[in-house]
């Protein structure tokens, strides 16, 4: 092996280290090796320089060898460098290399170790260096932490604490739970557990006393992880893309400065109450949560922030933007509607942290939150106290608490939460949209109370001022201080004022509750008698407390047996299915302790369409004496609600009518589009897992999607037009002929969904091209069509280039039963069509003499009058281009025989006379070489320009083409009955100019973007000039991007024998 030619792996590695060994030995550069290469080196070392015993540790001094042996000298040099290497990266490619252990024995001085896809059970030699490692990265290698931390991989030993380890990255693994091996990382400061399958961290992070940065994003956590001791050192916590519904537990992290809980399931701003105690917090990310869609989200969030954090000198960053003075003023206005006090803190440490309820003052801080100030004693003042007598009402379920103690506040907060919960249950998941409706009814539970931490933030300050304005009785009290002397001034007691206002708010709230109950009783009629049931919780059938089941015309209630309180209220309009559970399933369920079994009791199963998982399934064991008859009575009442839901418009399961919306990026898509997403990280998937989400957003990859409700009042035609406008990839305003957009992104990525917008770009298909807005149809009939017998057939909005011109312009191509019209789009598509459409050209269908489909089906060339005129349509989407050609061909075939011109469409062929042939191959006799052709857009700063991308097996070209060609271009041939059946190709073709070219070997990586799925960046690195460059491209559909990556990957990986690196970033940065 060592006597092989100098191009062997050993000689190449030795030569590389002789040139760049200083950077490796100093730790500035990382030595990256394939596991197969490391195995080969170990075999050579053991053969010529070893062998060494399994207990060999420390630096190895090599024996002397003859100096005239270049092989031995090369191996000695290589072994010495490996022993002194500080940073190592190992990459494992499945199926490459020899079976057996992967030994890292030669590396004696490692400080940083990175493992990518390395089977951890095959890694040997870690026990000799783990105590000196400062940074450890392990991706796509482990399923449990103890495999690496406790057993040291393939060494299978009992490891002691990793005393020097400061940073650990265990992202992109298959971790489902943590274990006690984390206690070995006592000095750890940075921990990354993102992109795993963790559901609960339990208490395994409590031993990491020095932890400062914790990243557990993209997991399945439902609770905030506990960090110890008391989270004193933690400064950054990233919990993005989990399943958090509450932030309880964050109040312990006193020094937290950066918190990221974006894309979770936080529904209300009341869940942000723990943020009040985080005085050092400076960055907060909440985007993608249900509360983020609140119209007053920023103002409502600022209400729950600590005054010290909100008023920081450098500004508080909320969702990446500084909290503005306007947000704080809105908070101040909303807080000024009623007395506001500091929210209660959780018992997280000492008793001093949870005390201080009665000593809170009424003065507001600059940000609208009350500042706590000590009470002053004024001896010269005479306080006149008014008696506050409050008797319990007969309708109150329990006595009202007047004591201004924490217990009294808790009761008030609890009542407010119940009222808010009833409001949300009434309106479902879209409860924020009914805010104005609720306020006009006067039953809004969103009135501001004394405790902003556990109350809903004000939605509309102007509306709430009318609801929560103080009574006119207080005017008398304002006049009394003017009638007394300065020394004997009358001043009400602060606590008495709070008590009175609390009484009034509670009284008004109880009145609203009574009115709601009366309205409910008056409107909703009982559909059957109450049934005695026992709820069965979960799939295990754990028995709950017995209750009555009431069914009204709109709701289903669970009512307590003794106090007759409503335990649960479910909407019948959300009922999906009502069925009787089979006896075999019921007999196999366990019974909880303390609750006797119900042998033979039938089980009623109800399924609802709520988003919350706890409310989707209800199972009741019917305990009536005649249980079978009672169940049949319930089914007879509930089944009509499920059948009505199935008959509603949009409730069918037709995949063509259903649409989803992503909660992260608000993108709307069809079910079939969710399977077209790119796997940009395909080369780095776990070797032992291949999972796929059933419904994911094709734009950002999130699985937090909801099914949009289809309104039955919208006509199908209008709905189809809106979907076609959203799905089309050809809603192009202008490129080349008109100024580009300032953001540099082609306009087809920004499509309006306004009701007043025009739908001009239907999706491929006959029904799509034939549907048109009725206003546009009227304009065509009156202003464009010249013959009274002329009828509209189809249309498409597409960029067009006329013969003899180089710039393309947006155009509406309209086909009637006699003519083909080109209507130039002058500007914004709004208002009367005459203001933004200009008739440019009219061609009789019988004059068409040729139709040619361009390369890869991305353009369509039309000729008329025997080649005297021509134009090129540039949809750039092969599927849409072929669909329109098929539609146009059908119109031509439907012409009368006297007007029918026997022409058929041809496809552009690559021959030795083709314009691309010099770039593909110089041998005219050779077959057509393999290539990939794509029409796209090149982003240059803030503007874009149309280009063509040509890929061969060795070179990448950026081309500037003139689609219109010159006047001397040969016409398209006419294929008639007398001519040959073999279609002739186009002549010399459009002019061509190479803008830029790069060899395939210089391609280093491909960069994609989650929020811009149609943009990509090809990054090149020239090893000779050591310069890096890139091509920022934009395609018109996701299929083109997928095909482009697939075509590049095969020859590139064959050239380098490793996977092509694709990097996915969150957003497109136009400044780079």
Swiss-Prot record:
Primary location class: cytoplasm
Residue numbers spanned by region Disordered: 333-366, 441-522, 741-762, 967-993
A Gene Ontology cellular-component term: intracellular membrane-bounded organelle
Molecular function terms, GO-annotated: protein kinase binding
Gene Ontology biological process terms from the UniProt entry: protein localization
Source superkingdom: Eukaryota
Signal sequence residues: none
Modified residues (Phosphoserine): 388, 390, 393, 757, 761, 763
Family according to the record: Belongs to the STK11IP family.
Role according to the record: May regulate STK11/LKB1 function by controlling its subcellular localization.
Protein name: Serine/threonine-protein kinase 11-interacting protein
